[in-house]
Amino acid sequence: MPPQVARNLLRAARARAVFQSTRPAHRRPAAISCRFQSTEAVRQTPSDVYQAPPRGFVPRKEEKFVPTQSRKAAPAATLKLNSKNLSSLQNVSVPTYKRHGVKQGIVHVGVGGFHRAHLAAYVDTLLEQFNVQDWSICGVDLQPFAAPMRDALKPQDNLYTMIERAADGTSARVIGSITDYLFAPDSAEAVIAKMAHPDTHIVSMTVTESGYYMNENTHELQIDHPDVAADLAGEQPARTVFGYLYAAMARRHAAGLRPFTVLSCDNMQKNGDISRNMLVSFARHAGNNEVADWIASNGAFPNSMVDRITPRTNDEDKVSLAKNFGVEDAWPVVTEPFHQWVLEDKFVDGRPPFEKAGVQIVPDVHQVEEYEMIKLRLLNGSHSAMGYAGQLAGFTYIHEVISHPVYRQFVINMMQQEVKPLLPQIPGVSVDDYCNTLLGRFSNPTLKDELPRICLGGSGKIPQFIMPSIAEQIIAGGPLRRLTLVAAAWFRYNKGIDDAGNAFKVDDPMVEELQAKAAEGPIAQLQIKNLFGDDLRQDKRFVQELKTALEGLEREGALAMIEKYA
């Protein structure tokens, strides 16, 4: 055998960990083994070498993960993904439970990539390994732009492939936990009826930050937003998730049923509390105080922290899946090995045994908040730093940005010097090790996480991921130059032109207002009160830092400023 062929075969057979190491052998492409090393070994790992942490791993002292596994050779033929062909798929892990016999206890709104790599994957593990019978998922999309998802899932019997990519190999697993799918533009009534049905115990949602219609300054529902105003006026079909939740809750109240638990899986601190406040406010503004009081008194809105990097799927991913695993999937989801979910144990009408699938169930909302703060400010804050400053400098992927020495040093120093001192201390959790784990995750070259995905919807991200740290450093009198440069990079990004003069699309629900303000002057965007309030605008040190950073970005460009501030 030629040496190059042997090396290729060896590379194809390298270690890959599946979603759960305890998965039955017939579901698993191969066995795995794990070993742990001290944190000293982590620190000695070259900065450009990616090491995949175990799934659900919260970095603790004295732990380091190295997986080993092999998989079958590439298939000779391909098959379309559907229920009929499941048993014939040889190179992927497939469901063995009877999907048609499982009740749909969960309705999930927003069947995007993150949901399919996170909640749906956890539920699939429960269905496969623990004989859970009442908790499959009915997926729901509300907006017309989600029609391609409907068109992809329906012919595949709502099956899809989760492609898990580590630096040392790739695995594929067919997820079967979504057993029905409803598209609201086709039948809004069917969606409301499904939510109101007695078999529905949880309505979960991944609708992004902007889908909550919350004023970032007052934390109140934006009742003057056209979508919210239309729903409150009774226009059909509803435009917002709260229009559907309210209609379904009103029916359950009239029928004498319990409320369903509203489970936010969005990347926001206090996501459960926000969901509760927005829904109760919506009901009150709809003129139904009785239902509003009933929801407030009897409903459940658990807070959660969710984490898994999930890039956008592209045509190359589909071709690779067919070539290497023999699966023709109209819309697979690509993700990393790492995943984590910290969930408040606050449910009104039962829940699946999530902890069996690796979810960290905690009794206290403050524990969720602590994990969430660490994750949002370190992971998402660093993503924002790399995304906006990287886009301006002409980078394409996150792993390219973090591999550049200047950007890498900037991110490390921002995390260690400006963010870490503000974070809570959780017993048994090392923030230093978490930062090290993040650098490894960011460096994974196989994910190809595109910057436009990271930059999407900055008006909902910067006020959450960057501004709270700036505000706290202002109070503490601490360093904030790097954080301020990230905010300035977002202001500069909103012009839609990079440092080389190339135009790009600013994908943000507030894009018109942001760009109008950007045209007024360097820091005019800071005047948008529902994003920034009044306090930041009145702090002289911050305003001067912001002006200096913006002037530097305009004059010298992002790369030069990152180097200067690193």
Swiss-Prot record:
Reactions catalysed, as given in the entry: D-mannitol + NAD(+) = D-fructose + NADH + H(+)
EC number: 1.1.1.67
PANTHER family: MANNITOL DEHYDROGENASE 2-RELATED, MANNITOL DEHYDROGENASE DSF1-RELATED
Protein name: Mannitol 2-dehydrogenase
Quaternary data: Monomer.
Entry binding sites for NAD(+): 106-117
Record lineage: Eukaryota, Fungi, Dikarya, Ascomycota, Pezizomycotina
Function: Catalyzes the NAD(H)-dependent interconversion of D-fructose and D-mannitol in the mannitol metabolic pathway.
Keywords: NAD, Oxidoreductase
Entry's Gene Ontology molecular function annotations: mannitol 2-dehydrogenase activity; mannitol dehydrogenase activity
SUPFAM superfamilies: 6-phosphogluconate dehydrogenase C-terminal domain-like, NAD(P)-binding Rossmann-fold domains
Record family assignment: Belongs to the mannitol dehydrogenase family.
